[in-house]
């Protein structure tokens, strides 16, 4: 017995609904576009400029670059009170660690120097002997010494992020 087409035809279980198209709302597209745009802008800022453009700002006139700071000095030996008051803000007397580094460089240039430098001692008299980097505090600091003023320069957080990213990527 032959089958009729109407007997075995497909019959849906429920009323038919048109297929729903998945669409993102406009706010989601704006959010995704903003995120992608931000990533592209940061990538362009990190990758396009050279490393030199992310360097520290230059020292002021009359100051000399030293590591991440700037130094200025007076070649005339003076008393501690005069030395402390002679550095213009934001500079202070050179910190002990920076003074030791500078003394190491200065010893290379003049091994016979026996002078002293006043160093930042957090309110106490402190100085550093140039020849060997040995320091003295209070009663051992009666003689005049040279004043070396110092102010640090530090790159901002974004500059540190950029330079560390460039280092991680091996970019010059």
Curated annotation (Swiss-Prot):
Main localization of the protein described in the UniProt heading: virion
Annotated transmembrane regions: 28-48
Keywords: Membrane, Signal-anchor, Transmembrane, Transmembrane helix, Viral envelope protein, Virion
Record's GO cellular component terms: membrane; viral envelope; virion membrane
UniProt topological domain (Virion surface) ranges: 49-172
Intravirion face of the membrane: 1-27
Topology in membrane: Single-pass type II membrane protein
Entry's localization field: Virion membrane
Matching Pfam families: UL45
The keyword rRNA processing appears for this protein: no
Entry's family note: Belongs to the herpesviridae HHV-1 UL45 family.
Functional description taken from the UniProt entry: Important virulence factor of HSV neurotropism. Seems to be required for glycoprotein B-induced fusion. Dispensable for growth in vitro.
Name of the protein described by the UniProt record: Envelope protein UL45
Record organism: Human herpesvirus 1 (strain MP)
């Amino acid at each position: 017995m032959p089958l009729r087409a109407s007997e075995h035809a497909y019959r849906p279980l429920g009323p038919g609904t048109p297929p729903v198209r998945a669409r993102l709302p406009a706010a989601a597209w704006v959010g995704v576009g903003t995120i992608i745009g931000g990533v592209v802008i940061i990538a362009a800022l990190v990758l396009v400029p050279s490393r030199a453009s992310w360097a520290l700002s230059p020292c002021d006139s009359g100051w000399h670059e030293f590591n991440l700071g700037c130094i200025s000095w007076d070649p005339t030996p003076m008393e501690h009170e005069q030395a402390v008051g002679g550095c213009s803000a934001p500079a202070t007397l050179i910190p002990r660690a920076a003074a030791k580094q500078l003394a190491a460089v200065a010893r290379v240039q003049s091994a016979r120097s026996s002078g002293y430098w006043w160093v930042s001692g957090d309110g106490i008299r402190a100085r550093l002997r140039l020849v060997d980097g040995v320091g003295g505090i209070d009663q051992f600091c009666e003689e005049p010494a040279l004043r070396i003023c110092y102010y640090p320069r530090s790159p901002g957080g974004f500059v540190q992020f950029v330079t560390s990213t460039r280092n991680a990527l091996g970019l010059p």
